[in-house]
Amino acid sequence: MKPDIHPAYRTVLFHDTAADAYFLIGSTVDTDRTQQHTDGTTYPYVALDVSSASHPMYTGQQRKTTTEGRIAGFNKRFASFGSGSNKETAATQ
């Protein structure tokens, strides 16, 4: 391996601002900001918009679409698309 080409791997404090949750994770992210954690140690700091603490997929707050509702919407939209024309032509022939 070539020397001095790899980024520094260190413990970084990530902050999910939506859920106000903090995570200590090993990372190579480059940041100039630092913040003191609850353990009293100062770590490099990165603010996040979304993490597993606030993402709807992980928190269970997502909106679920039922298949039955989608099928009913399809049938409602296309109910008159060819509903009576075949019956009328078959009866007259």
From Swiss-Prot:
The lineage's top-level taxon is Bacteria
Q: Which UniProt keywords apply?
A: Ribonucleoprotein, Ribosomal protein
Q: Where does the chain cross the membrane? A: none
The answer on whether this UniProt entry bears the keyword Cell inner membrane reads: no
Q: Which Gene3D superfamilies does the entry link to?
A: Ribosomal protein L31
Name any one Pfam family assigned in the record. Ribosomal_L31
Q: Which GO terms describe its molecular function?
A: structural constituent of ribosome
Q: Does the keyword Ribosomal protein apply?
A: yes
Give an example GO cellular component term for this record: ribonucleoprotein complex
One GO BP annotation of this record: translation
**HAMAP family, per database record:** Ribosomal_bL31_2 (MF_00502)
Subunit text: Part of the 50S ribosomal subunit.
Name the family the entry cites. Belongs to the bacterial ribosomal protein bL31 family. Type B subfamily.
Instruction: Quote the protein name from its UniProt record.
Output: Large ribosomal subunit protein bL31B
Question: Which source organism does the UniProt entry give?
Answer: Pseudomonas syringae pv. tomato (strain ATCC BAA-871 / DC3000)
Classification from the root reads: Bacteria, Pseudomonadati, Pseudomonadota, Gammaproteobacteria, Pseudomonadales
